[in-house]
Every structure is written in C-alpha cells, then in structure tokens.
C-alpha cells in the first residue's frame, strides 16, 4: 500500500522527468523526444504538482513542524499534529520563560508563513495553467476581406506589399487548419507545435503547466517558480532536522541512550533514548530532505534562467534557436554574454511586472490580461 512518503518520492521523480526530456529534445532536436513526452504527460504533471503541494502541507502539519519543536518529545504523543503542538506550547508558555515565549512567536510565524506560501503557490499555478495566450484566429473569409479592404483604402498598396502582409500569416497554422484559418504573426510570437496554435510573446511550452508561457502568464509563471523555490528552501530547513537526528547521528543517539556512566548523565541519556525512539517512529520520512534538495536544485536553476530572460527581455525559444545555430556551446555562451551586456536593464523587469507593490510579496499579484479581438 502506497503511503504519503512513497507518493512524495514518486512525485519528485515524475516532476523531474520533463527536464530530462527537454534536455534530450534540445540537444537532439530531430529525435523529438521532449515533444512527445509533453503531449502525453502534461495533465498528469499538473495533477502530481497540485497533489505534491497538498502532500507537503500534510507532512508539515503532521511530522516536520512538530518534530522541529519537540524532537525527543515526539514519542510522548500517539498522533502529534499542530493542535497537540499548540497545546504543548501554550502549556509550556505558562512558565513565562524566554525560550517558551520565543517558541510561541515562531510557531505563529510558521503558521502564517506556510499559509501565505500555499495560497500564493496555488494562485500563481492556477493563473499559469489557465491563461490563454493564443493569437486570434483569422478565417479565410476574414483574410480576403482584410486584404481587400487594405487594397481599396491604401492608394500606394502594391502587389509586393500585399504579399508581404500575407507572408505575415502563419503557414503552420494554415497547415493545421487545412487552410480554414490562420493567425497574423506578431513580434516574438511563435507557433507551438504542441498546442498547434501561435502564442503571443511565447517563451516556451511548459510541461509542468500543460500550457504555453506567453504574454498573459509569463509573470505568473516566474512568481510561481519563485515561491516554489522559497517553499522548497523552507521544506529543506524543516526536513533537515529529522534527517540529521535520525539518519546522520542516529547510531550515536542509540549508543548514548544505553550509556550510563554516572547519575548526572541519566537525564541526557533518557533524552537520547526518547529521540532514538522518535526516529524509529519517524522512519523513512527522514529521507524527505533529500527529495527537497533534489527538487530545489532544479527549481533554482529554472529561476536563474528565467531571471536572465527577464533582465535581457529575451525568450526561451529565442535562446534555443540561437543554440541550434551556434557551432558550439562556447559560441552560444559568448552570445548569451553579449546579449546580457547589450540588453540587460532593470526596466525590463518593471515592464513585465507593472504596478507590482511590496505587499504583493504576501498578497497575490494580479496583472490585467491583454484583450484579444476577433478571437
């Protein structure tokens, strides 16, 4: 029977799989491995990401935060969760000791911090996976009317000008629709072969969102990645304590718990014994720390890459296209450096996050969507 630990480990590896397929697809573009994987597992990844956040909150509630405060006292409760922990802290706080008051303050901080993390994570992820970045479809009849009206209203229109405007129509959209409709290309628009539509200001097709990252959700995607990194760092911090006590130093605690050289060490030995028993109860959940480290490393890499894109006003598809044209990785890295020197500006960040305020670090940020006519 699969338990919460097995689900977290399974989800961690499943979520990381698209990174491998993307790497293979970009390194060997003719193989099209990544494209096939994204088409098949997109919504499955969404399910696992949503479920993994919920599983993380459950483990935080029932395991890691209680262990963070109680450690050796964990064994004294049959099932220890936040309600039991709150009673324990309030009871201990009656002593009015400095450490007890500090524990109570930090306990409420952990509660507040986790709630705002979860709210922001779900909000930004929802906005990322539901955003519509498609360029409007233009039917064959509308194309004829459009070019006919331009011909009649513009006295200087030539055949070459009309052909130039027709060339702005996406040929791939025309193929997908069997000539029934197409879209007019815009600067930085790109045809997604997975969505089979042209995306306004496309950055990339994200397998983790089963959606393209474009004009209406790029900012939400970056904020989601940022809060994911923040949540994972917090998870690494809390999960480190059971990993350290129950994996790294477990043998020492077991040996010390049965060492009674003198009466002065009896209390310490009892604490070590209780901690050893607590670790036995914690069991394999101590290894969650390793899963957190694995995912936070990958997420932080994505965040760094997206930060570069924001500062330089670049897109992932643009960088990958440049990579394919480069003779070597060294030439590509030189181009990345030159691109940073020429285009890096703090104004690029402001343009992507207009009206972003300091309080949006806690309260979710909202950016008005770009209206699309004649969709």
Swiss-Prot record:
Transmembrane residue ranges: 4-24, 40-60, 105-125, 221-241, 285-305
- Per UniProt, residues of the DHHC domain are 176-226
Q: Which GO terms describe its biological process?
A: protein targeting to membrane
Q: What free text does the record give on domains? A: The DHHC domain is required for palmitoyltransferase activity.
Cellular component terms (Gene Ontology): endoplasmic reticulum; Golgi apparatus; membrane
Q: Broadest EC class?
A: transferase
User: What's the protein name?
Assistant: Putative ZDHHC-type palmitoyltransferase 8
Q: Which InterPro entries match?
A: Palmitoyltrfase_DHHC (IPR001594), PFA4/ZDH16/20/ERF2-like (IPR039859)
According to its UniProt record, what is one Pfam family this protein matches? Answer: DHHC
One GO molecular function term? Answer: protein-cysteine S-palmitoyltransferase activity
Q: What Enzyme Commission number does this protein have? A: 2.3.1.225
